[in-house]
Swiss-Prot record:
Entry protein name: Putative heat shock protein PS1
Subunit relationships: Homodimer.
Cytoplasm listed as a keyword: yes
Function text: Putative molecular chaperone that may promote the maturation, structural maintenance and proper regulation of specific target proteins.
Main location: cytoplasm
Organism the protein comes from: Pinus strobus
Molecular functions (GO terms): ATP binding
Residues bearing carbohydrate: 11, 18
Binding locations of ATP: 18
Keywords tagged on the record: ATP-binding, Chaperone, Cytoplasm, Glycoprotein, Nucleotide-binding, Stress response
Family, per entry: Belongs to the heat shock protein 90 family.
Additional observations: On the 2D-gel the determined pI of this protein is: 5.6, its MW is: 97.6 kDa.
GO cellular component, as recorded: cytoplasm
Amino acid sequence: GVVDSNDLPLNVSELVSNASDALDKLSSSPCVLVSGKFWDNFGKTZTVEVEDDSAEAKTLSKFLNAALTDKTEEVVRNWKLMNAAELLSEINRLSSSEWQAALR
């Protein structure tokens, strides 16, 4: 769902935005109800994704999608526990191929 900024009060503080009719309607819409706890977690989650059409986008996107609901230290620790060696080899491969292309 998209909320038009004209429908929100000018002073969009947490209390005011929580009391807004537009947000109440959005939070009870069928698409939100279907997704379960999406609305509860919305706003606490930030997603980083690959925004490139290259063949490597799918490979890297599984590593770069991260819910940043934890403290930064916890996110970094979790990233290290993920297949870090595989991620680094992909990044090195991409970097070296792009570097070689740049030298041509």
